[in-house]
Structure formats: C-alpha cells, structure tokens
C-alpha cells in the first residue's frame, strides 16, 4: 500500500463489504460532499473517498500545474489510488467533472472498473452548433474565469446558487458556497479552466465499462440534451431521468440518488 498516494489525496476507506465503490466529487468540492450518500453503501461495500490535489485536505505541495492543466492528470490520480489500494473491478461514482475523470481513467485501465455511475456528466460544456449544445457559449465561460480571478468570494456565491438551482434551499447553497470558498482560488480557477474548456466527446466511444448516467431536471450545467448525447454515444450506457432539480442531487436529493445507484448495482453488479 502506497501511503504517499493515500496521503496526497486524503484517501478514506470505510465499510466492510468485498465489493469496492469509489466516490469522486465534482469541481470545487471535496469528499465530504458525499456525506449524505456514501454511508448508505458501507454495509455491502468497501467505500473509498478521496480529495483531488488542491481540494479538501489533500497535500497542496503535490499540486503541479503541468500535471493538472487537463483532466488527464486527475484521471491518473484516480488510477494511482486504485493501485495503492489494490482495487479491481471497482464501481466508480463521479459527480459532474468527476464523472469524466473516472471515464478517462476507465479508458486507460478498464480492468480496474466494473461500472461507472455518472451524476450530471458532460463531455463538453461549450456549444458546438448545430450538432451539439453543451449549454454555454465561450464568452460565458471566459466571464466565469474572469470573475473567479477578480472576485472569488462573489463568484462562489453566484455559482453555488446557479449550480444548485434550489432557491428554496438556502442552507444547501451556503454549504456548497463554503466548499468553493475553502478551495485555493488559484488552483480552483485552473481546475475550472481544465474542466469547462475540455472536450471529451471523441473519448465516449472508447469506453468499454458499462455506465449509468443520472440526469437531473433543470440542470443548467449539464442540460438534458447533454445527457441524451452521452447516452447515444457512450457504449453500454443506461440513462435515468431524476426527479431532482439542479446539478447536485447528492446534496439536494440524497435519498433519490442512493435509490437509483442502489437499483442499478442490484441489477447489473
């Protein structure tokens, strides 16, 4: 067991089951974002939680701009953790960009993963008409990066509300906002650039691991057209429409998230 890797990514292992399930956070979040979901799987699974380098309680000294200027560096971190824990045929549950990171890892080392559960994923956030609508124009994303640089706290407030799309749930907005604010602003901006300007549409056809796509209602970050596109181009995928609104069902609707993941695992694992 490589303790250096486990320390770098602040890896936590819980549960007592034989099967392994790994939970990956989305942009700007750490492993605690899964607090309302992950414990439900501890009875039957070995649950693995981790932080991206630069987030949560990871080792900031390990951050390397060249390594993490694309999602490939984060995907390698996932593979490093799998190897450090000697994981095989692991269920990978990723939120948002975390889902794409897991997907890229599975392309490199498919034998390490049995299934992918992708919560609100998007292979490309930029519109590319007429074939593809990711939800954003380039100037919108450039504006997001500019706001992060000029007023990070203000950006965190606005972006948390936009992502959640839960105006009647201020406590959840404050929780997500605090997670954004706890991340190093420079690293967060670089991660945002790597995530929101990436285009992994051509990688979808390379995936051989079966997957479940969980599509939220009224998701501004990953709209329904994106979920359908992924399902059409991702081999061995299933698409499930959630009742949950917004982009963070594991925070706003944990019970539904647990139910849908559990149902998929019972039927396919």
From Swiss-Prot:
Pfam families: Abhydrolase_1
Family matches, as InterPro entries: AB_hydrolase_1, AB_hydrolase_fold
Gene Ontology BP terms: biotin biosynthetic process
Protein name: Sigma factor SigB regulation protein RsbQ
Superkingdom in the source lineage: Bacteria
Signal sequence range: none
Induction annotation: Induced by entry into stationary phase, but not by carbon and energy starvation.
Source organism: Bacillus subtilis (strain 168)
Family stated for the protein in its record: Belongs to the AB hydrolase superfamily.
Function: Positive regulator required for energy stress activation of the sigma-B transcription factor. Could be required for RsbP phosphatase activity.
GO molecular function, one term: pimelyl-[acyl-carrier protein] methyl ester esterase activity
Residues annotated as the enzyme's active site: 96, 219, 247
Effect of substituting residue 247 to A: Loss of energy stress signaling
Coiled coil: none
């Amino acid at each position: 067991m490589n303790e250096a890797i486990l320390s770098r990514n602040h890896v936590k292992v819980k549960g007592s089951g034989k099967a392994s399930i790994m939970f990956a956070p989305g942009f700007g979040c750490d492993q605690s974002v899964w607090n309302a979901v992950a414990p439900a799987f501890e009875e039957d699974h070995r649950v693995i939680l981790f932080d991206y380098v630069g987030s949560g309680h990871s080792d900031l000294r390990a951050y390397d701009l060249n390594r993490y200027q694309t999602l490939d560096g984060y995907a390698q971190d996932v593979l490093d953790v799998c190897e450090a824990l000697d994981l095989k045929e692991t269920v990978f549950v990723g939120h948002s960009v975390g889902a794409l990171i897991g997907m890229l890892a599975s392309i490199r080392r498919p034998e390490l993963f049995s299934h992918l559960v992708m919560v609100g994923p998007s292979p490309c956030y930029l519109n590319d008409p007429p074939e593809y609508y990711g939800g954003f124009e380039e100037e919108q994303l450039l504006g997001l990066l500019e706001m992060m640089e000029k007023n990070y706290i203000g950006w965190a407030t606005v972006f948390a509300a936009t992502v959640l799309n839960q105006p009647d749930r201020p406590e959840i907005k404050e929780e997500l906002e605090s997670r954004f604010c706890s991340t190093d602003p420079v690293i967060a901006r670089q991660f945002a650039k790597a995530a929101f300007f990436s285009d992994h549409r051509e990688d979808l056809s390379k995936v051989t691991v079966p997957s479940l796509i969980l599509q939220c209602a009224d998701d501004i970050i990953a709209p329904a057209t994106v979920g359908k596109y992924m399902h059409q181009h991702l081999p061995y995928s299933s698409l499930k429409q959630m009742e949950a609104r917004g982009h963070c069902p594991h925070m706003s609707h944990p019970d539904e998230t647990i139910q849908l993941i559990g149902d998929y695992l019972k039927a396919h694992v």
